[in-house]
Amino acid sequence: CKTSQKSASSEVTFFKLTESVHQWQQPIGDWKEVGVIQLRDGDNSAFKVEKGRGIFLNHPDAQTVNLLSHAQHGDVSLHVEFTVPEGSNSGVYLQGRYEVQVLDSWGKTDIGHGDCGGIYQRWIGGRGLEGHAPKINASLPPGEWQSFDIVFRAPRFNQSGEKIENARFLKVVHNGVPVHHNVSLNGPTRSASFDDEQPLGPIMLQGDHGPVAYRNIIVRPLNLD
């Protein structure tokens, strides 16, 4: 689904990545589209679901592969809504390379880069580097729908293909609370789909760390030159 909205000064084009599983590259593993999702009765670590559309679920009580969008993006504004059960873990990767962490971090007071809303660390030479903790723990309880609103500036390259500017998270807002501002990234974060850096790349949803569901993924390409 691609929509254009015109104002007196500009045209804004956006598209949703939760219209069809066909918007995502094969294989999609156990990911499927459902209509309703709730915590399982008596078990906050798993989901129960009802048939329908609009919600992408990796698995009610386990894990599967990561999802990579067919669509490629550079500079972008991204809105994404997600829910995890108790103790579960996922992540949203811009360009398949740079992760904003999804985790059940409800109630934690000592938070780090690996908590929900964190920009995950890089992994070089067997050790972690450069992770960025969210400024505030804005997490909601397990099973509640949460949101990220992200403004991302892609890395820049010269005509020889050499990187001349780092990728940056200009803004990350978690459940309406700003948690990052203008964070520069020296390279892909841990468990990225690609080790290199490029002007364009796909959205990646991590599905191999536990149950997670996503809805209302809205991608708005930008030009941040």
Feature annotation, model-predicted:
Residues 1-225:
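Carbohydrate-interacting regions of secretory-pathway proteins
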